[in-house]
Amino acid sequence: MDKRKFPWQLLPKQTTKSTDHGADQKSTFRAPAHDQVGFLARAAAKWAVILLALRQILTIGTTMVVSRYVSPEEFGIAGMVLSFVAFLVLFDTGLTWVTVQSPNLEREKVNALFAFGVLLGVLLWLAAFIAGPLLATFYGQPELEVVSLIMGAAVFLNSLTTQPAALLKRQLKQKTTNIVDTVALLISSIVAVAMAVAHTGYWAVIGQAVALQAVRSVLLFIYSGYRPTWPTRIGSAVPELKMGMGLALSNYICYFQLYLGGILVGRYFGGAILGNYQKAYGVKSMPTAYATMVVTDVMVSSLSALSTDRDRMGAAYLKALRLIAFVGCPAGAMLYAIAPEVIRILYGAQWGGAVPLLEWYSVAAVALPISTTTIWLFLASGQVRLQLKMNIFLSTLAVVVLIGALQIFGTAESVVAAESLLFAGPYLVINVVLSHRAVGLRVMPTIKTLVPIIVGCLACTASAVLVGSVYAYLIWWVLLLAKISVGGVVYLSFAMAFIRPMPLVSKLGGNGRGA
């Protein structure tokens, strides 16, 4: 990236669009040809690496500042609404990926999907308004009435971006997408820090969420090249809407796997413990975010484009899986050994209650990079019904196990422990098996790819824990460096001896040979 330019200066210049509406309605948004997928994926991954690094610096820096001005109790109040908002926006995810996957996509269909998305956004904002008093009663926090109404604006703005974002992903224009996301994060981070320093409490968290969606929606419309018009045949998108609703329904059911723990903690233990829970949950997700954000959008689009060529799809998936597991799994495992130091650096001394929760979450953090890749396969296959059945079973299991753990042990830590064991056990195994079945891939090559990586994770974590116990008298930051250094050396030594082939980013979007 040109160091003399800001991210928004790197966005592609827009060309003048035709005003011939008749021709415009007949135009299509074509997915890349098979022989272009590798080149576009590699180019997108290179840009994503640079901009992902920048976004993570912004995210961590913002978190470090805001967490020192906003208390765990106030973060917990914001989190009570954010969990509900996450539930509302799940339908938008279905509308996004159905556009990415559609083999033939005319502008009229996109317009129909956009119109439906706008209507949905209005209804979701209304739902946020109605839910405010209910959330306030459920959690015992009167502030949630107003907070829910304001956060509804972010939900509405997000619904406007589903089609512009989907069209960019469909065409593998990840450079533009990543720059848009980076600029939106930069501006929203400035808003959050300014509000936190001004001692606005939980409004700093809410303000960042709304500002992020506002900036992102404007930029996506500008740089996607999509200009919506009212559809003349709204029924033209009925097949896509049905598929999108199927994906959304699956997401809604899956929601309980991801957020039930937080809902229970907030309901029974209050805002302060929920704040610690959310911080630990966020750190648990970081290794997966670092490892997968670079390629997730690229891989869904690429695998969808290669869906008729099973051999190339399998080779591309294994290469991406190997890379993501190689980076994300050991990083997740090491969270067990370095939890006290990580929480201290990121959030400050007031967040010590998050440490034991993060230690438990390290178990889930090892599995998450792997299970995240299975989502690509489900999306690429288009087998919504299979994914829906799986999520119904797993969500039912989550409800039974988490409520059971709460009733038996009665602590927030027991809820986190149950969550982690579910993530690393039933969730992972069932997702891997069924996602491979959905696209017709064999499971055994995936298992062979993962076994040496998992063993290496255990070795590096054990060595780091040993260092921590032997040299516990050291200054905390020196001890952190010692743990990371020893754990890293052990893992890389193990990898060089047993992991073949070694993951290479430059091979990610290759032609499928030598997976």
State each model region's role:
Residues 1-35, 432, 436-446, 450, ...:
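Membrane-proximal transmembrane or re-entrant/amphipathic helices at the cytosolic face
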Residues 2-18, 22-27, 115-140, 146, ...:
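Alpha-helical transmembrane segments of multi-pass membrane transport and lipid-handling proteins
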Residues 2-27, 36-94, 116, 120-134, ...:
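Signature of the first transmembrane helix
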Residues 11-37, 41, 175, 218-259, ...:
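Interhelical loop/hinge segments that connect adjacent transmembrane helices in multipass membrane
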Residues 42, 97-107, 157-181, 198, ...:
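Membrane-interface junctions at transmembrane-helix termini in multi-pass inner-membrane proteins
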Residues 44-59, 205-212, 216, 220, ...:
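Transmembrane helical elements of multi-pass membrane transporters/channels
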Residues 65-80, 137, 143-145, 172-175, ...:
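Membrane-interface helix-loop junctions in multi-pass transport and translocation proteins
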Residues 89-107, 169-170, 280, 284-328, ...:
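Helix-loop junctions and terminal segments of transmembrane helices
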